[in-house]
Regions:
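Hydrophobic positions on the alpha1 helix immediately C-terminal to the Walker A/P-loop
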Residues: 16
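NTP-dependent small-molecule kinase module
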Residues: 19-21, 137-199
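Hydrophobic anchor at the beta1->P-loop junction of P-loop NTPases
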Residues: 3-5
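Walker A (P-loop) phosphate-binding loop of P-loop NTPases
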Residues: 10
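Conserved lysine of the Walker
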Residues: 13
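Conserved phosphoryl-transfer catalytic core
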Residues: 21, 25-29
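A glycine- and Lys/Arg-enriched "phosphate-lid" helix/loop adjacent to the NTP-binding pocket
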Residues: 94-165
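ATP-dependent small-molecule kinase phosphotransfer cores
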Residues: 29-122
């Protein structure tokens, strides 16, 4: 089983992933915990480039998208697909839905570019995607409390409003796969809500 976790900054994805990871391990199941961008040594290097705040040069939106997909291709081939072949459960902090929300809805890139990349480089989609939804201000306050903000976290409120709208669009278009979780609840309540969808 392949499960991805989506949402804007500070909505509690990491906490939920840990809880679900523990839940499956207690059932004796083998679980692979991973993230995007990242998940392999090479993809983590790309992640560092993507998140770094560079005051000397602004990264173009196309460059950002292509770097994310370079990391994703490596991640799929080296981690996700081998784990699924071995009947392991894969829990990924973000996947392709993040690219639609951040790069298409947030940055304004065309959906055609994303579709082309997905058709060529994404051979497997999650069975379940949890979208943790909370007011943007709440998530950003949580992100600031964690310390120094990365390149994405430093974006304006208007950007994250568009990102959230992107996630909402996906949720409405694929309700069978994408499950919206109310991330204003306590971590335990969010976890219990997620378990209902996992049976």
């Amino acid at each position: 089983m392949f499960i991805s976790f989506e949402g804007t900054e500070g909505v509690g994805k990491t906490t939920l992933i840990r809880k679900i990871h523990q839940h499956f391990e207690e059932q004796g199941k083998q679980v692979v915990l991973t993230r995007e961008p990242g998940g392999t040594p090479l993809a983590e290097q790309i992640r560092s480039i993507l998140l770094a705040v560079n005051h000397d040069e602004n990264m173009s939106h196309d460059t950002e998208l292509l770097l994310i997909y370079a990391a994703r291709a490596q991640h799929l081939q080296q981690v996700i697909l081998p784990a699924l072949v071995s009947n392991k459960i894969v829990l990924s902090d973000r996947f392709t839905d993040a690219s639609f929300a951040y790069q298409c809805s947030g940055r304004g890139l065309s959906q055609e570019k994303l579709q082309l990349l997905n058709q060529n480089f994404v051979s497997r989609m999650p069975e379940v995607t949890f979208w943790l939804d909370a007011p943007i201000e709440l998530g950003m306050n949580r992100a600031r409390e964690r310390g120094a903000l990365d390149r994405f976290e430093q974006e304006k409120l208007s950007f994250f409003t568009k990102v959230r709208e992107g996630y909402e669009t996906l949720w409405k278009s694929e309700p069978e796969r994408i499950k919206r979780l109310d991330a204003t609840q306590s971590p335990e309540q969010v976890f219990e809500q997620a378990l209902q969808y996992l049976g």
